[in-house]
Amino acid sequence: MKKLVSLLLTLCLLLSLASFAAADVPADWQPFAERVKITVPVYDRSKVGYPPVDDNYWTRWIQENFGEKYNIDVQYVAIPRGDVMTKYSMLIAAQETPTILMEYDYPKVAQWANDGAMTEINLDEFKAVAPTFYQAMVDNKQLGYTDINGKTYFVLTERPYYDTTFTYATFVRMDWLRKVGYDHVPANYAETVDAMNKIIEAGLTTQPLGLGIPTSAYITNFGFRDFPVDEKEWAMHSSLGTPGFPWYPTQRMLKRTNAEYHMGWYSKEFDLEKDSRGAATDQTQTDFINGLTYSYGGYIANNMPWLNAFYENNPDAELAIANPWGGLEEGVNTGAIRADNPFGMIVGFSSLATPDQLKAAWMLMEWMIQPENLFVLENGIEGETYKLGEDGLPVMLEYEGEHMLNHNNNIDMTCLVHASKKVGTVEQTIAQMSPAGLPQDFTQMLIDNYYILRDIADKGLAYSDPVFAVAIESESEYSATLLSLYQEYYAKLVKCDPAEFDGLFEQFSQEFLDAGYQEIMDERLEAYEAGNTTKLPVAE
């Protein structure tokens, strides 16, 4: 009986997908009379064991099933995940701007628009070619993000459950916690301090936490901000593109890290390493794999090579998921988190693109958003890369052959449609993406983690950065220099004598302001006061 129900569910699913696609793909699509070439960026995460991101079975599958049908050459361009702006700058300077330009961070796409690398678009024309994609933007209330400086440049993809960030999780050594008397993961900062110091005292490791120099401008200081945060200060400082260094939450965050350093939590040579926070392989990941550190975080996927490597090196270890409230400390950290933007990729189009190339790019987006195409790209081939469960939903299988999906179920290709895979309910989505083939099943822990994050969001403690409807030109001019300064100051402030911390922070803050940050603050505040930015969410 269960098999019959499963079969019926599957048939209904596939029939509904087919009818949806037939109804929604524009009937007037015809092959181009002459061959049209489009170039599409795809993140290269340099992950060992994965096929090349720009030439693999699935890039060829898109060419065969979409490109050949409409006389379009679809060529993928590898973009190093850890150095996005440098690669794009090189392509733009060489007059090789990809037909599609896309990024998760608004300041980056704003810079491309401001620098003339992107073309203006007409949303009515886009809607005529890509009606399903356009309607998804309407349904997700994203049309307000398509313009900058009063001109339309962007279309936006979906980000499911954007205010919970559940697709990223930090794994911790539960076996170490048990050895020092804990039957749970620390649920506030007092417990975290107690646990880390006991782990050191017990000789389980010498430096329990990994640390390196930040590789991105984003400062993880949301929890260290007052709640509610002052909206003007938020508009001036909260950014993924420029470090909000001379601001009190950054001071609080770094003062805590300084105290942790002097408690012996970090290597004294941490400043020789980079910390990519799970975006790429670095020493912090290697140390965790080798059983030297307590925790490491990354994006959740069925196949997580660093977790596989960890268990190979530590077969008797027990892991758990870190509690999102683990940094909570009255007067210091509220537990607030950065919510993702209410959109995934911000997608623009090259100013060098011809009208046919623009249309071909829009056709690719419309074709990919059709459920039957998206299903194949995210799941692969039944019996090899996935099987159907009793509920009729795909269950990913361990597979490393020719048809292997790339990072996180091909997300760096399907991000042209949405930021993460979504299947049924949130519980089903998590179960479907939970790491497979490990000694432990993390599905329930990840579901529990989602509901803790949901609680944080429901309390109003999850919000994102402001999005500006005008270009902040000073950011384009100074951001690279300011990131370099932040990296320098970070190392010095973490290592300095605690008695010298406040004086050094004040000195470095003034230097940071003088190096261009004051201009950025002024320009962002002017845009905010002119009504050219989003506002903080209003508590319900």
Regions found by a protein language model. Name each.
Residues L8-S16:
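Bacterial N-terminal signal peptides
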